[in-house]
Curated annotation (Swiss-Prot):
The keyword Disulfide bond applies. Coiled coil: none annotated. GO terms for cellular component: extracellular region. This is Struthiocalcin-2. The modification Phosphoserine is found at S62, S66, S68. The keyword Disulfide bond applies. It is found in: Secreted, Extracellular space, Extracellular matrix. GO terms for molecular function: carbohydrate binding.
């Protein structure tokens, strides 16, 4: 059965649905995976403290984070990235960057993709190598 218009296993928040995927992919492959799930599905974009909290709560209740200490310790991809040759961050779904919760927002040439930082219980964002393989969150609008 669908929850608030979301597919089974997805979490609803404010007209969007979020799904956590534990398989580890590069940022680009994760975005491609999300897009293949359906029209208008992308890596998650975050536009408010409330939306961020909803995602953090979902991660807290997702495997493998809740079961064993040594499993915890991975950042989780979201849809923020800096396209090649650009200086500005962009969401993969094309929405505007109007909220931030940076652990560090630094211009590191080789680090152009953003993940939720596990050491702060996913409360902050950090810049990572896009080729790093991490679990990820997909999102679609209902």
């Amino acid at each position: 059965r669908e929850r608030a218009g979301c597919a089974k296993g997805w979490i609803p928040f404010d007209g969007r649905c979020y799904g956590f995927f534990p398989q580890e992919l590069s940022w680009r492959r994760a975005e491609g995976f999300c897009q293949r799930l359906g029209a208008r599905t992308h890596l998650a974009s975050i536009h408010s403290e409330e939306e961020h909290q909803a995602i953090v709560s979902m991660l807290a209740s997702s495997q493998p984070y809740s079961d064993s200490e040594e499993e915890a310790g991975e950042e989780v991809w979201i849809g923020l990235h800096r396209p090649l040759g650009r200086r500005n961050w962009e969401w993969s779904d094309g929405t505007k960057l109007d909220y931030g919760s940076w652990y560090r927002d630094v211009f590191l040439r080789r680090r152009a993709c953003v993940a939720l930082e596990d050491t702060t219980d996913f409360a902050t964002w950090d810049v990572e190598l896009c080729s790093d393989r991490k679990p990820f969150i997909c999102e679609y609008r209902t």
